[in-house]
From Swiss-Prot:
Disulfide cysteine pairs (residue numbers): none
Record has GTP-binding as a keyword: yes
Organism: Lactococcus lactis subsp. cremoris (strain MG1363)
BP GO terms, sorted: UMP salvage; uracil salvage
Domain of life: Bacteria
UniProt family annotation: Belongs to the UPRTase family.
Keyword terms of this UniProt record: Allosteric enzyme, Glycosyltransferase, GTP-binding, Magnesium, Nucleotide-binding, Transferase
Xref: Gene3D superfamilies: 3.40.50.2020
SUPFAM superfamilies assigned to the protein according to its UniProt record, in alphabetical order: PRTase-like
Regulation: Allosterically activated by GTP.
Official protein name in the record: Uracil phosphoribosyltransferase
Segments traversing the membrane: none
Listed InterPro entries: PRibTrfase_dom, PRTase-like, Upp_B, UPRTase/APRTase, Ura_phspho_trans
Function of the protein: Catalyzes the conversion of uracil and 5-phospho-alpha-D-ribose 1-diphosphate (PRPP) to UMP and diphosphate.
């Protein structure tokens, strides 16, 4: 299986088309990021291992399938990544939530890390690292660096975004060829300011109504 996947589910593509529109309000944008995050989680979790468990229904005892004991952590890259968390938690409410805080230096376009707060047992968890955008790839690379420094296993890390630029995908794959990348759309390119084209604008500003 390829370590890069564009999730082409019709509901995801439909909601993404509405999310991209410049006239979408902050409320609409926030709700759509939440919904797409939930749908992406459904697709990304397809390969979670199952185990047989014996239960008792009102009629009789039986053997059923349930997700095996592996624990999950959702780790948003702040601030925009926080918009995807609630949608995923609706599907996987027992997941722990960590945070990696970064901002982009507007002159160098390089990410600056200011916060890392993770579950103590992050090394034993499956990790959904989430950020709506994969632009230059700098923030994602630094975030994966931070996870690996804290003994997270590469095979347990899945980077999940809504829109990606080819440049960002290439950079992340070159820096961390051992993690999986999922996106709802692979866009055309980055512009001279480091923004994805056609993209959806600044996801953080659109989520929180800031400039």
């Amino acid at each position: 299986m390829s370590k890069f996947q564009v999730v082409e589910h019709p509901l995801i593509q439909h909601k993404l088309s509405i999310l991209r529109r410049k006239e979408a309000s902050t409320k609409e944008f926030r709700e759509l990021v939440d919904e797409i995050g939930m749908l992406m989680a459904y697709e990304v979790s397809r390969d979670l291992p199952l185990e047989d468990v014996e239960i008792e229904t009102p009629v009789q005892k039986t053997t059923v399938k349930q997700i095996a004991g592996k624990k999950l952590a959702i780790v948003p890259i702040l601030r925009a990544g926080i918009g995807m968390v609630d949608g995923i938690l609706k599907l996987i409410p027992a997941a722990r939530v960590g945070h990696i805080g970064m901002y982009r230096d507007e002159e160098t376009l390089k990410p600056v890390e200011y916060l890392v707060k993770l579950p103590a047992d992050i090394a034993d968890r499956q990790i959904f690292l989430v950020d709506p955008m994969l632009a230059t790839g700098g923030s994602a690379i630094l975030a994966v660096d931070s996870l690996k420094k804290r003994n997270a296993k590469a095979e347990n890390i899945k980077f999940v975004c809504l829109v990606a630029a080819p440049e960002g995908v290439k950079a992340l794959q070159e820096a961390h060829p051992d993690i999986e990348i999922y996106t709802a759309a692979l866009d055309e390119k980055l512009n001279e300011h480091g923004y994805i084209v056609p993209g959806l604008g600044d996801a953080g500003d659109r989520l929180f109504g800031t400039k």
